[in-house]
């Protein structure tokens, strides 16, 4: 399993199949954002005083992330997205 460092977050992106006029559009088409599940979070970042500030998101939460953010990584057969917490726009409740 991947263990992110600092303010990074490992996400499992939800692939949604979209249809337009009977044709299937691969991936998210032209969407500006995508929905993902938080799989793992880093320990946080340190302030100038050395205090550790933990991340705002937790494992298991669904989040909205910028479409072109992060780096795609593989762990075995599974594909994940590694992003900085700043690229996460909202928690989906």
UniProtKB/Swiss-Prot annotation:
One term of GO molecular function: protein-folding chaperone binding
CC per GO annotation: cytoplasm
Keyword terms of this UniProt record: Chaperone, Cytoplasm
Gene3D superfamilies on file: GroES chaperonin
Pfam families membership: Cpn10
Keyword Signal annotated: no
Subcellular location: Cytoplasm
Cross-referenced InterPro entries: Chaperonin_GroES (IPR020818), Chaperonin_GroES_sf (IPR037124), Chaprnonin_Cpn10_CS (IPR018369), GroES-like_sf (IPR011032)
One GO term of the biological process aspect: chaperone cofactor-dependent protein refolding
Main location group: cytoplasm
Family: Belongs to the GroES chaperonin family.
Function: Together with the chaperonin GroEL, plays an essential role in assisting protein folding. The GroEL-GroES system forms a nano-cage that allows encapsulation of the non-native substrate proteins and provides a physical environment optimized to promote and accelerate protein folding. GroES binds to the apical surface of the GroEL ring, thereby capping the opening of the GroEL channel.
PANTHER family: 10 KDA HEAT SHOCK PROTEIN, CO-CHAPERONIN GROES
Quaternary structure note: Heptamer of 7 subunits arranged in a ring. Interacts with the chaperonin GroEL.
Protein name: Co-chaperonin GroES
Organism of this sequence: Streptococcus sanguinis
